[in-house]
Amino acid sequence: KFTTAHGKLNLPAEYGLSWMLPKIVGLGRANDLLLTSRVFTSDEALTLGFVNQIFEPAELVAQTVAYAHQLITSVSPNSLRQTRWQIYKDLHRDVASAVIESERLIEDMAMEEDFKEGIAALVEKRPPDWPSIK
């Protein structure tokens, strides 16, 4: 279960929740959750996009490890790092600035060994062996 209980305690939406929640679930849904301070279930959290998946407690660690394994074996570490940076940076930019920056990054990253390995792995239909983690 989840809640934004601040309203029931005479507190404001704390720790940036009023900034973050609308970006995750949309303005209307964020208003509902923040203004009512109601409890919502994991199923509703999934529907809202607040969480990506739901697992039984006994499965949580194994599923988390499987997800991490998928990331580190299929996605370039450089791409992960750069994309994560872009996601958070682009929250504060307009789309034109984001596109310009992505074009610059493409030029830079296309010169890296991980790019060459990614292309080779795709063509050869095999898992990549990222040079950046050797």
Question: What annotation goes with each model-predicted range?
Answer:
Residues 38-44:
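Acidic, divalent-metal-coordinating active-site segment for phosphoryl/phosphodiester hydrolysis
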Residues 118-134:
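Short, basic/aromatic-enriched C-terminal tail that caps enzymatic domains
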Residues 21, 45, 83, 122:
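Terminal peptide-recognition signature
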Residues 1-34, 63, 67-68:
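CoA-thioester-processing core
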Residues 48-49, 125:
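Structural motif
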